[in-house]
């Protein structure tokens, strides 16, 4: 570490890093989209952002124990290449699962297509698209936590014992397809133009890297709007009362509105992972959710200590809700 965590310089860097990296990434995406080879240059910007974040993970880590190798780096990269690479190939050839579904459904809903405000400035269209897509992403994420038929695929993402920039894209491809479908089909049906999808993809890519990074970032009021590292660490907690919260992909607007926002005034959890067991190899991880034995291994059995933690967390959450209700009544 170059500077002490108690120094003013450290505090300033920690507070500015999240917005600075996001703005830098989106600025790079702007120039990439204006080029003739926008996917190539976008990937250059994306990988450069990964390198910068990886550097800060060494300089100012949130959790030092997460710097130790866990034997999953190859699997993390392989899943990223399969899911994110597949999405980029689909974008390059102009076809994807949600687009195919929308193409079939749009004739019956053609009166919806002119609802999209394409006369608005692109920045406002992107913000609108983010909010609409976020609802689908939120629901896909929440359903994946609340239903075992979907959790068996999503558990792969939560199976790691550390968060760092390289396991950002650690998703089962079925999980990814489900999220993309719920997030993008509504936009296709509404007639959103291609640039809106490109910009939503860029925002999602860079916020995803930041959300999963092991960097000590002080995000403060940004936690009320965006999905930040602090909020996402709570989401990866082994304790269900903490883990089944903060489902937002980019924004936490739907968490705020639907009662799943969680940000208690204490350091976010570092006890992350799942109570079940995920296979070791890349191909085995892809196949595991499809077998009965694999599903049982993924679900696992909760240890007594974890059950006690969950009960305590649930009681604390109930106490906070009651206290807030009393304050509102007295006001």
From Swiss-Prot:
Q: What is its EC number?
A: 1.-.-.-
Topology relative to the membrane, per the entry?
Multi-pass membrane protein
Identify the GO cellular component terms for this protein.
plasma membrane
Q: Which UniProt keywords apply?
A: Cell inner membrane, Cell membrane, Lipid biosynthesis, Lipid metabolism, Membrane, Oxidoreductase, Transmembrane, Transmembrane helix
| Ranges where the Fatty acid hydroxylase domain occurs | 126-260
Task: Name the pathway.
Answer: Lipid metabolism
Tell me what this protein is called: Ornithine lipid hydroxylase OlsE
Upper lineage is: Bacteria, Pseudomonadati, Pseudomonadota, Alphaproteobacteria, Hyphomicrobiales
Underlying gene = olsE
């Amino acid at each position: 570490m170059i500077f002490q965590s108690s120094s003013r310089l450290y505090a300033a860097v920690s507070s500015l890093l999240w917005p600075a990296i996001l703005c830098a990434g989106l600025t790079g995406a702007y120039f990439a989209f204006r080029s003739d080879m926008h996917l190539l240059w976008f990937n250059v910007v994306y990988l450069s952002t990964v390198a910068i974040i990886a550097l800060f993970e060494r300089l100012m880590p949130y959790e030092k124990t997460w710097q130790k190798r866990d034997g999953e780096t190859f699997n993390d990269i392989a899943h990223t290449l399969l899911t994110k690479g597949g999405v980029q190939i689909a974008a390059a050839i102009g076809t994807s699962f949600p687009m195919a579904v929308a193409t079939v459904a749009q004739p019956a809903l053609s009166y919806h297509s002119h609802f999209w405000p394409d006369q608005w400035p692109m920045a406002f269209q992107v913000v609108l698209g983010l909010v609409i897509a976020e609802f689908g992403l939120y629901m896909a994420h929440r359903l994946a936590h609340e239903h075992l038929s979907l959790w068996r695929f999503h558990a792969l993402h939560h199976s790691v014992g550390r968060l760092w920039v390289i396991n950002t894209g650690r998703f089962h491809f079925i999980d990814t397809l489900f999220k993309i479908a719920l997030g993008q089909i509504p936009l296709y049906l509404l007639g959103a133009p291609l640039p809106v999808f490109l910009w939503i993809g860029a925002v999602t890519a860079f916020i995803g890297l930041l959300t999963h990074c092991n960097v000590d970032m002080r995000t403060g009021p940004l936690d009320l709007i965006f999905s930040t590292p602090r909020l996402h660490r709570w989401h990866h907690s082994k304790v269900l009362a903490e883990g089944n919260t903060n489902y937002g992909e980019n924004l936490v607007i739907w968490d705020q509105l639907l009662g799943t926002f969680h940000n208690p005034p204490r350091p976010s959890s570092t006890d992350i992972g799942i109570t079940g067991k995920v296979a070791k190899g890349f191909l085995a991880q892809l196949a595991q959710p499809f077998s009965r034995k694999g599903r049982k291994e993924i679900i696992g059995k909760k240890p007594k200590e974890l059950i006690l933690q969950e009960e305590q967390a649930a009681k604390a959450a109930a106490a906070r809700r009651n206290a807030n209700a009393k304050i509102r009544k007295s006001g």
